[in-house]
Regions:
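C-terminal helicase lobe
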Residues: 1-145, 149, 169-193
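A short, conserved structural fragment
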Residues: 59, 154-167
Length: 194
């Protein structure tokens, strides 16, 4: 707060916010060096938003300062339950890989989620993705859980976004594997979520 007074701060965001911010950075006319800096800042902000430890420690750490837990932020007052999303992450990454291998195409979040959750949509059938070994492997996870895992994978760079331009001039984002995908797929890097 100001002048030593307490203050409240609220942050609300979702997966689409992450996608939109990454797209704005990628489509910016700025130099690649500047884009890298901006991607790093976005990743730091996402790490703060997804943190399960003291936010003050995280925030001051970003600026090179050390602190002890504040006892005042949401995480200190009500430590979030943390669950291991590694299995869900591996299922999502495997599906992205298998979809690209089977069809030579990349798809967006909704389609990948439909495959993982075993939804028999027209689009899933059209591309034969209901025949993939990963079809329905994540039916035990809620859509919210899988979106949280995907948001974390985007935040850590284990999943990338590729823009696809249509003839109409419209574009959409598809999910792609990155160099950061392999350690998660192999189980070398855990994916812990709140």
């Amino acid at each position: 707060g100001r002048d030593g007074l307490n203050a409240d701060a609220w942050m609300a965001y979702g997966l689409q916010d992450v996608v939109n911010q990454r797209r704005m950075i990628d489509e910016s006319p700025a130099s690649e060096e500047f884009k890298q800096v901006m991607r790093g800042k976005l990743d730091a902000l996402l790490a703060l938003a997804e943190a399960t430890d003291c936010r003050r420690v995280r925030l001051l750490g970003y600026f090179g300062e050390q602190s002890t837990p504040c006892g005042n932020c949401d995480n200190c007052l009500n430590p979030p339950a943390v669950w291991d999303g590694t299995d869900a992450a591996r299922k999502l990454l495997s599906t992205i890989y298998r979809v690209q291998q089977a069809s030579g195409l990349s798809f967006g979040t909704g389609h990948i989620m439909d495959i993982v959750r075993g939804k028999d949509t027209g689009k899933v059938k059209q591309f034969g993705h209901d025949k993939l070994s990963t079809f329905g492997v994540g039916k035990d996870y809620s859509e919210a859980q899988l979106r949280g895992v995907l948001r974390q994978l985007l935040a850590t760079g284990a999943v990338g976004l590729q823009k696809v331009m249509l003839e109409s001039g419209h574009s959409f984002d598809t999910l792609s594997l990155t160099d950061g995908s392999r350690p998660v797929l192999k189980g070398d890097v855990p994916v812990l979520l709140r």
